[in-house]
Amino acid sequence: MKNSFVNVVVAGLLVSVGWAQDAAKGSTLSPSQAVLESWNDIGRKLIAMAEDFPEAKYDFKPAPAQRSFAEQLLHVAGSNDLFTAVAKGEKPADDESRTNYKTKAAVVAYLKKSFADGAAVIKLKGDAGMAQTVVSAESHETLQVSDLAYGLIEHSGEHYGQLVVYYRVAGMVPPESRPKK
């Protein structure tokens, strides 16, 4: 009786381990998929903020020396454009000035386009392309495309954190911090 019980428990554990391994295989992302997921996640958060923040407060600065809310978003979008251009082997454009994007709608559209363009390049590159090397337009160092992408994802995350402070100082709650409906 005792041996039968032990055999059943061991058999059950082996089946469970097999199922867990099969499930893990199915959920493992390829390198380019992992980059794309992170890229899209921070993009979603920043776009939600850009769409949510009142247009009347788009030029709000917590302190005079800081960028405005709009300028922060434009800086992120311009940095995304830098990634896209470098990954494609092109010269980056430099048009993130607030004078080029006067309305909330224009800022939001540019931010959305910058994340969409970056996502398209990541998809186009795939795993092999993520391992290709490029020269960073900012630091002039040679990096893999995936490292450049992760650097920009981190950069966007840093600005997301700064914009959370803008929300709080303006007496608002950022979209990600609100209770889920």
Question: Model regions: which residues?
Answer:
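Surface-exposed helix-capping loop/turn segments at secondary-structure junctions
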Residues: 52-58, 122-131, 168-174
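Short, contiguous alpha-helical
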Residues: 36-40, 44-47, 57-96, 136-181
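Acidic/histidine-rich alpha-helical segments that form the ligand environment
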Residues: 38, 102-136, 143-158
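Feature for soluble, non-membrane regions of globular proteins
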Residues: 23, 120, 177-181
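Positively charged n-region of N-terminal signal peptides that target proteins for export
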Residues: 1-6
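Bacterial N-terminal signal peptides
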Residues: 7-17
